[in-house]
Each structure stands twice: as C-alpha cells, then as structure tokens.
C-alpha cells in the first residue's frame, strides 16, 4: 500500500484553480486563468466509476514527490445525447471533442507545495514520484502571482458602481465545505425580466427538490440562485438565424444538433465565481430563457424552460454530479473490458458489482418483463451496447427520462454525497500525547470503497502527525500517514471497504487541534 509522507505549513491553506484548456499545434495547452486561496474544502476525486478518460491534478513538493492527487473530468471529451420529448427515450447519442474547455479544482497549498501538475490518465500513486512527463506544470511562484492578480480583479469588480451578478440562497442546510452546493443561473434574461427569471428558477428548483433522490439527500445539499442581466432576451438559435447578446452565450444547434443547448463555460465560471467561493459552486446549472426543448451535460449542465427541462437536467446531472453511465443502447459501444461506471457491467452473473442488491428469487441474467420495473437484476443492454453490457434494472432515469433512479443508482449517488459530509472533531494534546477519531464508541468507522479525506489543524509551533489505520486479517495496519514539521497535515487516500480509524499524535508541543474527515459510505 502506498503511503504518503507530507510536510505542510502551520496554517492550513488550499488553492482553487480555474484552468483553461485549448488545443494547440503541439498538443493540449493548460493555463491557470484564476486562483484563490482559503480554508475551503478540497475537490473530491472523481469516483472510480466515473466515465471517460480523466486528467490527474497533483501537488508536489520540491523533490517532486506527490503530496496530493485528484482526478478531474477531461473537458475535451463531451458526450452528447438527445432525448425524444414525447417518449423520453434516447434519439441520438454521440461523442465529440471540444477544442477548448475549462475546469476548476481545489488542492492543498501549504508551504511545502512547490508545483501543481496536470497528468494524463495513467498517473502516479500518492507518495511516489512520477515517471511520465506532465501535460502541464505550474510552479508555486506563478500560482502565487495568479492568486494576487485574481484578488485584484475581484476587488476592482466589487468596487464597481453595481455588481454584475447577485446571489440568493434558496436552501441552506449547513457549511458549504460539508455540502454539495448547487447553483442555478439564468441566461438570456434582461434586467426587466429578473422577476420572470426568479419565477422560472423557482419552478426548476422546486422540480429538482421534488425528485425523490434529491429530496432524500436534501440534508446534504445547499442551493443558490444567481441573477445576472443579459443585454438581450432569449437564446441563439443558429439553425433559425436568430442571435441574441446574452451573458453566457447560450445557443441551440451547437455541433449542428437541433436540441443541444451550449454555453460559454469560461463566462459561466467567471460570473458564478464573482459571487460564490469554490465551496459554494460544486454543480452549476444554466437555465436559458427559451421554451425550446433541449439541454446538455458536461462540466456545466444546461436546460431551457421547456416543460420537460427538469427531466433533461436531472438525467444530465446524473452524469455531471454523480458520474453515472447511460443505460441505453445506441452510440459508440465497447465491451473489451469492465466499464468503470458503477451502474453497468460486462458481468452477467450474480457476482456483478451490484450483486448484493439482487434478490435470490430474481433470475440472472434477467429478461425484460420477467420482473417488476425497479427490481434489481442483470438486464442486457446499456452504455450504448445492445449486447455484452448489462444494467441493473429494466428502466431507470439513466435509460429513459421520467423513470425513477432505482436502488443501484441511488446507492452510487449516496456515495458521492458522502464525500461532502465531513465530520469535525476537536481536542487538546499534550506533548507526546495521542488522540483518536472517532473518539466515540465503537472507536472506528465502517467505510466503503473510495477516497478518504482527512485534514488536521493544530497549534502554531507544535509538530503533530496524522495517520489512517485499517483493520486487516492480521490486525490494525497503518495505510496512510502525513508527517511533517508542523501541526497541520492532510491525507487523501483511495481505499477499499472496511473498518478504519484516525490517529493524531504530538511529536512535540501541545495545544488544541481540529481534525476533519470524510469517508466513502459503506
């Protein structure tokens, strides 16, 4: 098991980066276009079942050792899907490559962080030096310069006569660093139409929160509405020769697809980022001022005010926020290896990845119509393949709009929400003392597969160490450690299901500490 040895500054500090992506003659170019530092949450790594190739963003020390690593979406890959407005079934599915894109990521930025690299999908484990050249490298000096420039731009914007955007909190269940925060922003609404936008936003948000999946996880969510006026009302409809001057350049018929609604993602991030911190914008949904049917997924979800807009957006958020696979046929099919998504598989037996949810009386493989819809089984067809790929239920929202999510998808969503539900424990250590988390009975945590995030903040001048232990057949074993010359440490560990506990140890010095941790749900 790889173990990380981290040295970090006394004061916990993270950096949020907005990185532009563009295609150049010599390959893909990455450039930081915005940066800010603060005590906000780290970006959760994409689930192991996330579809498509991913970029890895790593923070290194001066020796080149990886201190932190996170998987982010490859924004150059875009899967396009168009649903039938009458039946909810898929009409068209296609993969396209975007020349330009943008993504945001939050990483530790302690004193020992010397650089941030972007790597190809095959990457190094935490604590081991990379053996492949990075796609991009940003040294600390350039990042600190970008932080200063971004702060100056934001200060100048706040000093303007009237802010371009305003924000309203609709649902507030707790601190943003321990919640999945949803942002709904309107495009193509003029200043005179702000009342209409606010009414439209209420319809969409109420529709989201009425969905059983979101209603069940309401306690783990915050929802905000961002208002910004466009110069003109409506949306570009390129196929009809209609063009509008809007805040985020919303347009139908992008990629020559009638029902595809796209926006300028850089403008979206800039506008939302001007009024919300990194913790407050986990999932962004742009609502265009049009009743034309359409929408899209990707890093940012889009929808119109068509009566079916909520259904389209819910499916797309299944991709954007929860990394769920499509469960329909049609498109580019591949069955050479096990899909990484948690709701599709090439395994047609009871040992399939969701096998624990299959009742003994349910036949496997499972024939369509043989059991009630929603019954978990092994149904042929999914992830664009009519044969060789299997899905857990006959019909779910990831196959046809208007259907429930069902148990397997609900469980995968619960895992993602669990990454935002951090536990905070405080205490006091004397020199040489040891404390454990959790400090309540039974003294350990039962966790599932996924990423474990632990952050320790202690008193200045002290040296505290942080360790993560797992129960193995041979006893408790230390699987990750953060050990430096200060009292602030962090662990980002990808582990398997089992029992865990955290140890905080004073190497020297005494005082109060805070340990914050989140683990994948069992």
Residue ranges: model-predicted function:
Residues 408, 505-522:
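Edge beta-strands of jelly-roll/beta-sandwich modules across compartments, strongly enriched
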Residues 87-112, 122-127, 131-134, 485-495:
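Beta-sandwich interaction modules
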Residues 196-197, 294-314:
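Short pre-active-site segment immediately N-terminal to the catalytic Zn-binding motif
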Residues 54-78, 144, 152-273:
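Propeptide-to-catalytic entry region of secreted or membrane-anchored zinc metalloproteases
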Residues 14-49, 451-458:
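Short amphipathic, basic-aromatic surface patches that mediate peripheral association
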Residues 311-327:
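Active-site recognition of the HExxH zinc-binding catalytic motif
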Residues 433-487, 493-498, 506-508, 521:
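Acidic, Ser/Thr/Pro-rich low-complexity intrinsically disordered segments
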């Amino acid at each position: 098991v790889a173990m990380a040895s981290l040295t970090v500054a006394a004061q916990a500090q993270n950096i949020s980066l907005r990185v532009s992506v563009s295609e150049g003659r010599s390959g893909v170019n990455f450039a930081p276009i915005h940066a800010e530092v603060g005590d906000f949450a780290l970006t959760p790594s994409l689930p192991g079942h996330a579809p498509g190739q991913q970029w890895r963003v790593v923070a290194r020390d001066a020796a080149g050792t990886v201190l932190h690593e996170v998987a982010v979406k490859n924004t150059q890959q875009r899967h396009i899907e168009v649903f039938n407005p009458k039946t909810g079934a898929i009409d068209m599915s296609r993969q396209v490559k975007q020349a330009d894109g943008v993504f945001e990521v939050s990483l530790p930025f302690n004193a020992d962080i010397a650089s941030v690299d972007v790597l190809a999908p095959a990457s190094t484990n935490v604590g081991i030096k990379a053996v492949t050249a990075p796609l991009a490298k940003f040294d600390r000096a350039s990042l600190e310069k970008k932080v200063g420039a971004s702060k100056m731009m934001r200060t100048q914007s706040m000093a303007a006569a009237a802010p371009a955007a305003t924000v309203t909190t609709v649902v507030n269940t707790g601190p943003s660093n321990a919640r999945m925060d949803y942002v709904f922003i309107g495009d193509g609404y003029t200043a005179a139409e702000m009342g209409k936008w606010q009414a439209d936003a209420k319809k969409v948000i109420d529709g989201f929160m009425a969905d059983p999946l979101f209603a069940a996880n309401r306690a783990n969510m915050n929802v905000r509405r961002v208002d910004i006026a466009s110069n003109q009302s409506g949306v570009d409809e390129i196929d009809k020769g209609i063009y509008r001057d809007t805040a985020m350049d919303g347009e139908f018929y992008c990629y020559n697809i009638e029902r595809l609604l796209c926006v300028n993602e850089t403008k979206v991030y800039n506008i939302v980022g001007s009024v919300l911190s990194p913790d407050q914008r986990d999932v962004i949904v742009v609502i265009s001022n049009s009743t034309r049917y359409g929408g899209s997924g990707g890093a940012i979800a889009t929808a119109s005010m068509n009566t079916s807009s909520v259904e389209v957006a819910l499916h797309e958020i299944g991709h954007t926020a929860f990394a769920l696979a499509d469960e329909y046929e049609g498109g580019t099919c591949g069955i050479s290896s096990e899909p990484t998504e948690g709701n599709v598989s090439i395994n047609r037996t009871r040992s399939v990845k969701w096998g624990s949810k299959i009742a003994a009386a349910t036949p496997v493989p499972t024939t369509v119509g043989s059991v009630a819809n929603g019954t978990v089984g092994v149904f042929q067809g999914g992830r664009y393949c009519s044969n060789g790929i299997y899905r857990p239920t006959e019909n779910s929202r990831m196959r046809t709009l208007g259907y429930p999510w069902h148990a397997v998808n609900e469980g995968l969503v619960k895992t993602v929400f669990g990454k935002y539900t951090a536990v905070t424990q405080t205490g006091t250590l004397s020199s040489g003392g040891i404390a454990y988390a959790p400090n309540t009975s039974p003294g350990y945590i039962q966790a599932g597969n996924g990423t474990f995030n632990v952050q320790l903040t202690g008193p200045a001048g002290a040296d505290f160490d942080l360790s993560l232990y797992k129960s193995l057949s041979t006893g408790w074993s230390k699987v990750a450690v953060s050990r430096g010359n200060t009292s602030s440490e962090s662990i980002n560990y990808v582990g398997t299901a089992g029992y865990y506990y955290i140890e905080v140890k004073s190497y020297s010095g005494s005082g109060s500490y805070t340990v914050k941790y989140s683990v994948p749900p069992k």
